[in-house]
């Protein structure tokens, strides 16, 4: 477990206006955390909204808009019209992530957790479209999937719990997913 503890762990979650890899990104949360204790570090953690600012090459899906409208139209309104203090241009967010990830790579390594590959694929696509078409923000070997740990958790009755529903607030969803990871890693650490 020592090798994985030396790495910098980040949970990422996005809220978007499409399920395609070139979706318009409405909200980004990045949370730096300890996978065993679940402790969240303020350094490397942020939660920003992008609203409908121009994102070169991004698409918006009517089906996704309908889904948002049916699922949580009040939160969609907040995402579409963010307060000034919550708003950040996506290009700035991508540069900020790049700096954090490069620092982590130079200091023990980087692991980026998400559900499936959706969030990482969208971030890499946006990075190539907006920042540099010849660079990748997150390398495939740095990606970890929360679903794998949830599957392991389901194998052990002591770890089976009621899974909180996704709120579709990117930061809250990051914290929920960190809970899955922490439950499993703490259980496995006790088995040593």
Language model segments and positions:
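Conserved non-catalytic scaffold segment of RNase H-like nuclease domains
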Residues: 2, 6-10, 15-113
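Feature marks short, surface-exposed loop/turn motifs that line or immediately flank catalytic pockets
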Residues: 18, 119, 150
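Acidic, Mg2+-coordinating catalytic module of metal-dependent nucleases/exonucleases
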Residues: 110-117, 121-122, 157-192
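Substrate-recognition/cap helix-loop segment adjacent to the acidic, metal-dependent catalytic center
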Residues: 101, 117-140
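Short, flexible loop segments at boundaries between secondary-structure elements
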Residues: 137-157
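Acidic active-site catalytic centers that drive phospho-/nucleotidyl reactions
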Residues: 13-15, 119, 145, 173
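Residue-level signal for well-ordered alpha-helical scaffold segments within enzymatic catalytic domains
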Residues: 78, 96-99, 103, 121, ...
């Amino acid at each position: 477990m020592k090798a994985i503890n030396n790495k910098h762990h980040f949970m990422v979650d996005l809220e978007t206006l499409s399920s395609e890899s070139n979706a318009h990104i409405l909200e980004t949360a990045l949370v730096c955390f300890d996978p065993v204790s679940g402790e969240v570090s303020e350094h490397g953690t942020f939660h920003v909204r992008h609203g409908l600012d121009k994102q070169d090459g991004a698409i918006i899906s009517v089906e996704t808009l309908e889904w948002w409208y049916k699922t949580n139209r009040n939160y969609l309104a907040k995402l579409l019209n963010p307060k000034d203090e919550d708003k950040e241009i996506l290009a700035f967010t991508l540069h900020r992530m790049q700096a954090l990830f490069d620092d982590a790579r130079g200091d023990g390594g980087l692991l980026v957790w998400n559900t499936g590959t959706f969030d990482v694929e969208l971030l890499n696509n946006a990075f190539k479209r907006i920042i540099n078409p010849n660079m990748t923000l997150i390398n495939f070997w740095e990606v970890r999937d929360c679903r794998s740990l949830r599957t392991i958790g389901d194998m052990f009755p002591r770890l089976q719990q009621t899974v909180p529903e996704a709120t579709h607030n990117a930061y809250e969803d990051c914290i929920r997913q960190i809970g899955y990871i922490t439950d499993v890693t703490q259980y496995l650490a006790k088995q040593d």
